[in-house]
Every structure is written in C-alpha cells, then in structure tokens.
From Swiss-Prot:
Record-stated family: Belongs to the UPF0473 family.
Organism: Clostridium botulinum (strain Okra / Type B1)
Identification of the protein by name: UPF0473 protein CLD_2004
Pfam families for the chain: DUF1292 (PF06949)
Amino acid sequence: MDNNVDTITLTDEEGKETEFEVITKLDIEDKEYVVVVPKNEEVDEAIALRIDNNDDGEEVLVPVEEDEEFNMVAEAYELLFSEE
C-alpha cells in the first residue's frame, strides 16, 4: 500500500461503500497495518486493519480481530503518537 494514501474506500458485506481517512501505516513484526477512521462520521475509536495479499497477490485489508494482535497494533499506535 502506498504510504501517501490519505483516504481509502471500503465495501462492507452488504455492498455499502464507506470512505475512511488513513491515520497512519505501521510495520510490526514483518506485517503491515493501517489505522483508519470513517471520514464523514464522528467516532471515538479508530479501526486497525492488517494488509494481506489474496490468492491473486492483490493487497486486501483484513480487520484485526485477535486481542493479542490488536493490542500490539494499539501499543505501536499509542507509542507513535505519544512522541509527537
């Protein structure tokens, strides 16, 4: 995924498209993640997505659902933004 991407559009299971603002991209333990928030909605929480490759080699974004992995991403995110 390009580091200069500011917004992405994701499609949910029902085909509804939502535009998200990319807050940051993180490289953790040989995996890439993006932290996003819905662009036109007020929310208190960001969403962590892992960048994987599908069977065709295309990049896909997968929600981080395992607690251990989510905590690792959240910790890296907090560390990054506590330094600013």
